[in-house]
Amino acid sequence: MIKAIFDTLCPNCGGEISAERLLKGLPCEKCLPEEVNREEVCQKLENGSFKEFCELLSELKDWEDFFKEILGTSPWSLQKSWARKVFLGRSFAMLAPTGVGKTTFGLSMASYLAKQGKKSYIILPTQLLVEQVSERIKTFGVDEDRLIVWGKLSEKKKKELKERIQKGDFDILITTSMFLYKNYEILPKDFSFIFVDDVDSFLKTAKNVDKVLYLLGFSEEDIHKAFELIRLKEKPNKSEEDWEEIKKRSEELREIAKKKKGVLAVSSATGNPRSNRIKLFRELLGFEVGKPSVLLRNIVETYEETQNLKETLLKRVKEFGKGGLVFVSSDYGREAVEEVKKFLESHGVKAVTYEEDLKLFEKGEAQVAIGISSFKNPLARGIDLPHVVRYAIFYGVPKIRVPLKVETSVSHLLWALLSLRPIILKDEKLKSEVKKVDTWIQRLRRYSFLSDDFVEERPDLKDRIENLRKEVQEFLLREDIVEKIKNSEELTLRLGEEGFELVVADVTGYLQASGRTSRMYAGGLTKGLSHVLVDDRRAFKNLEKKVRWFNQDINFKKIEEVDLKEVLREIDEDRKKVREILEGKVKAEQKEHVKPVLVVVESPNKARTIANFFGKPMGRKIGGIDVLEVMVGDLYIMITASLGHVFDLVKDKEFHGVIAKNGEYVPIYEVIEGKENIVKGLRELAQEVDTVLIGTDPDTEGEKIGWDLGALLSPYIPNVERIEFHEVTRKAIKHAVENPRDFNENLVKAQLVRRIADRWVGFEVSRIVQQAFDKHWLSGGRVQIPVLGWIIEREKLYRKKKHVVQITFKENGRWLRLGFEFQDKKEAKEFYENLKEIDVEVLEEREELKNPPPPFTTDTMLKEASDRYRISVPKLMQLAQELFEYGLITYHRTDSTRVSDVGIGVAKEWISEELGKELFYPRVWGEGGAHECIRPTKPLDVEDLRSMMLAGQLQNLTREHLLLYELIFKRFMASQMKPVKVKTKKVKVKALGREQELILTTEILEEGFNKVYPLELQPDLKGSVYVEDKKELKSVPMAYLYTQGSLVEEMKRRGIGRPSTYATIVSKLLERGYVIERHGFLIPTKLGKQVYEFLKSREKIMPFVSEEFTRKLEELMDKVEEGKEDYLQVLDELYKKVNEFEKANV
């Protein structure tokens, strides 16, 4: 157990508490002197703020007992989480699949609250449901005299009930949403719980949002203020004044939100709510209501090529059985839907179309339902029947036809250009036109969001769009472009009645339609089958490629390669489970189907990326922190961010924040200034769940942040586990969530040693430097100072000159520089003046294989990117961090060159597709272990990313992000490619009695990795070579100044600094004014030299800031991380030295 103390973190009194107590779920010793089991804490505590949490647990237990008594089963974890929210007074939307018991929960909660004399209001969409629900709730032990149901009533009864409603003479009121709309004036304003069972129906009348808010205690003025803030937030091109106004109004609304008297719980929407009024819930109640989409798929994706669509369709429908959706490609037109229906029915297959009543299909009386494979089609968009739908067959590849005429819709032209872009890029002659195409795409994308009415009302805008259409049309009909399309493997050009039309795959249509076969239910995700009847090979190839932009896990297989019998058996097994759950045959305690889990990561970017992998998340705000909620398999995930470290060593207690006693070293941590809201919000959020997964970065810093968060949350959550992932991809996250682990205490100890060493040495040295120079901002870190010394020494060498006679050869893009060095300037000048030619003797000529460089580690990436692009090392680390968080590269703080099987798969796919299978040459490079090289996570090159940005699928990437990504991508792909076979020559160069040997690479015999990562060739020199016009006499430095990149390279070579600290060291030297950067080179300042000389002259200080001390300490920290060294012994040795040094009062 690691010993540590956290200031102000006792969950009961807010005082000091040990990490040991926190991790055991206990308050501090002052609050509870004896150590008891977590379960006994509430019984033993007499007073304090933790009693509120105890009361929550007690209320939850009472509700669970009540639930079990009325229903005969225990509630599921998700229902318990909803109950916690109600008891905590938090309004929320229920994101949950079919069969999880949303209605049951609402009724049980209303019934439970009624026993306490608290009022509930249940709002339903139809009169029929009002009657069904009222009958059901009577079986929940509700006193019927305290229940008001607004159903089919006589006028007398209506009058009587309205009077009772007005007086508040009831515990539970059940009505339709229309009743609320017409009668809200008579409704009391003291409801404890309002349950909206069908939010889609509720929202048909947008004013219902206002009315339910009145019931919760808000005024008309409050709602007006909230709506004004919504309008302000949605205003385009906001000014600084607008942002100030948003801040001011948000603070005012936070106060208004405290008026809320009850809890509103609504079921999540199944359609996209159209009214902006729905956003009032976000501003006043802290939660969003949107259409949740689940992007998880459990679908076997197959295809077959066919010349006869109808016959093949009939064969497959008969083979697959009932529960099928048939999607006709939109290029066949709506009439084809009827044709297909008639054809199937003429061969004994009962079918219905999307325009007919689907009840026959749901009952199993119709074998298939037929629609169009477009995301706009109701069958592709709206059907959610997990117990019925088993498979989807695509009658032709889903396609979009783009007529090449002026009237073509803006969105279709956009698709056409996006599909054409990669083809233009591969053509050397057309490459120069990509910029123009990109500009068109950006403009078309902007216009695609505008409605026809909006455009019609603005003649200038209409003209601009018409002119753009004409430009694009002329381009698409150009002879060379038409030829390019005709020869393409992915696009089809057809000559129809109205001229040429371009045919591209409808990717969103495919994903939306096939997704109907795999739906969330209370047991997870149903298995489905999607089968494409390929009528156009090019369109299918286009579909295969584009579908990977959305989901890397989709792989089409030929139908012959699939065990169809087994797939259909698994599909039927799932449908049976769904039916049993819907019919109530499966009891909840048989299996915990959907489990709520809190996931904490470091950054909001990472939280968003992860949440978006699994669907469109719903947002909430708790205690000032943002939470995203989404379904991941059988987990209901609430994901939030800690924004990095939350705690740091205190500054003014004990020995620089550490209790040092008898060989024991106990750090004291405090909340970092500005992070108080995060601590409060995380603890409030923790009270809603039983499990938290900590997904901080996979290194020592991430492990320590995670361990701190574990200590913070443990009093409220019994299960705190660590999840580790080295790339932010759907597959990696899912694997991590399914395989949590304990915290690795060795990693935590290593970070603890690093932080304490930095604090002890840094504080002591900085104090002395600040006093000596009377500048309070100066510092002297244990890594900073030796690195400053190198820069100073390098500058001294830079000022010393040597003389070089340089000969430069340029030949067909090839370069070679030969240099003859001299210490004496006169001798150099004499050599230069007499040099007319050189003699090149070929000593050996051979063929050899040149291997590619390994993939990047942190130091090699920083060196190459910094030197190539002149981007600072801290900025590069920020760019890499963001690329990692967006899910585009693996973790960027690494010393490893190892390539995983997943990485090799990424390379294989891209190299085989783009360059040819013969160039793929897999290599693992480094040793085994958790860490991997820096590589792309998907087989997408930089132009794919640009296309995705233009299509709106990737946001927030800058030119610099793309430069770094391209470098990482090419270096990695090169590392997985064939060596290059080259011709080399070993030559001896003689000139005026001087000679030197060189190895020249003169010819590429067989292509390999050079296809992506250029290989330098030198001119083929031999015999006597005239150099009179190629020579130059120069004075050059003995050594060149460091660049940021070469400084990182030096740190790595000398064993100082680590992947997580390189950038910090460089930025500290610049921030403190010890070093400046000029033309990309690092130059020590006068202050930097003075500080270094001052420290160097103090023999008692220098050992602590020497290269040797720092390197040894880094090695010891590595050993602590590996469990080979006791961290307390390392701290003990360090303490003795620092303490001695302090006492000496240097």
Swiss-Prot record:
Q: Where would you find this protein in the cell?
A: Cytoplasm
Q: Name one GO biological process term.
A: DNA topological change
Chain ranges of zinc fingers (RG N-terminal-type): 1-38
EC numbers listed for it are 5.6.2.-
Q: Where is the active site?
A: Y891
What NCBIfam families has UniProt attached to this entry?
rgy
Membership in a protein family: In the N-terminal section; belongs to the DEAD box helicase family. DDVD subfamily. In the C-terminal section; belongs to the type IA topoisomerase family.
- Protein name per its UniProtKB record: Reverse gyrase 1
**Source lineage:** Bacteria, Pseudomonadati, Aquificota, Aquificia, Aquificales
- This protein's gene is called rgy1
